[in-house]
Amino acid sequence: MSQTNLLLLCGGGGDEHAISLLSANFFETSLADITGFNVLRVELDADGHYHTKDGDICELTNRKQIRFEDESKRPWPVDYVIPCIHGYPGETGDIQSYFELINLPYFGCDSEASRNCFNKVTAKMWFSALGIPNTPYIFLNEFNDDAISQTEQALETWGSVFIKAASQGSSVGCYRVDSIDELASSLKEAFSYSPYVVVEKTIHARELEVAAYELDGEIVATKPGEIICASNTFYTFDEKYAADSQAETKVEADISDELSREIREYAVKVFKGMKLSHLSRIDFFLTDENEILLNEINTFPGLTPISMFPKMLQNHGDDFTEYLYSNIKSQLI
């Protein structure tokens, strides 16, 4: 493969901006071990401005070039993009839509798959359509008395619920409600993040994760890892990334081979069915009765030093740098 100009786009300006920068560091380290790539790291900030690590303001044009505000700098042609952006506008499919419009190849899921997975409403519909068990739920599209009434009925039926903004990631806009006293305020808060809200039955279960990815044209689903939270808590954004997090992670969950096989089969089924590409982290619940429930899909999982995706990939016996090179090469040949 000839010399390739690779744009490493990171940030995004959303709630997961800082995590995106840490993941970009991981990519930079891996790309440094691959010959044939010229890498330019560009950060997208909260104001929608692009700038390099040196602070040069720039933009990605429809001519597939990075054009600098300082016109004395020559435009930098782009052959390939890694959109290392968690949440909006990366996992939402927005940035991928632009790449597709200008015919620029990129790493990760396409715009439609990203959008379908990120939105909890469409994701739930897909899970059910594919015949994959998932948590009981209701959908709401407006914060009003009827929405409050429906949620109160769900709380009465299920005993405890999670109220989730439909279009947010990493547990942002997600609230556990055990009492009717906190229901309306949590619902209002969730609607402040998204025009659609999902109300799910609280599941008392183990939280398992599978790294599902493509390698040399094949779909790989690792053995499930596990997130172990403190009693009566869930894996919030703060629990994921706080220095004093009480959550414990296991790269390989202590479950039977039969359960592991069934979970991995579900992961491959949803990867194929929703037409994912290159990488994903697929999260499941496992109840005390050994019922498997698909929870959610992350189409661009974190790649920080504590993230599960790279750990599970390595535990499976694969090398991240080789995996990355394989997927980039397959698109450029």
Swiss-Prot record:
Q: Which GO terms describe its molecular function?
A: ATP binding; D-alanine-D-alanine ligase activity; metal ion binding
Instruction: Reply yes or no: does the keyword Manganese apply.
Output: yes
**Enzyme class at the top of the EC tree:** ligase
The pathway to which it is assigned is: Cell wall biogenesis; peptidoglycan biosynthesis
Which subcellular locations apply to this protein? Cytoplasm
Q: Which InterPro entries match?
A: ATP-grasp, ATP_grasp_subdomain_1, D-Ala_lig_Van_CS, D_ala_D_ala, Dala_Dala_lig_C, Dala_Dala_lig_N, PreATP-grasp_dom_sf
Q: What cofactor does this chain's UniProt record say it requires?
A: Mg(2+); Mn(2+)
Q: Which keywords does this Swiss-Prot/TrEMBL entry list? A: ATP-binding, Cell shape, Cell wall biogenesis/degradation, Cytoplasm, Ligase, Magnesium, Manganese, Metal-binding, Nucleotide-binding, Peptidoglycan synthesis
Q: What is its EC number?
A: 6.3.2.4
Please list the residues that bind Mg(2+) 1.
D283, E296
Q: Which Pfam families match?
A: Dala_Dala_lig_C, Dala_Dala_lig_N
What reactions does this protein catalyze?
Answer: 2 D-alanine + ATP = D-alanyl-D-alanine + ADP + phosphate + H(+)
GO cellular component terms, semicolon-separated = cytosol
**NCBIfam families in UniProt:** D_ala_D_alaTIGR, PRK01966.1-3, PRK01966.1-4
Family recorded in the similarity comment: Belongs to the D-alanine--D-alanine ligase family.
What role does it play? Cell wall formation.
Q: Which HAMAP family match?
A: Dala_Dala_lig
Q: What is this protein called?
A: D-alanine--D-alanine ligase
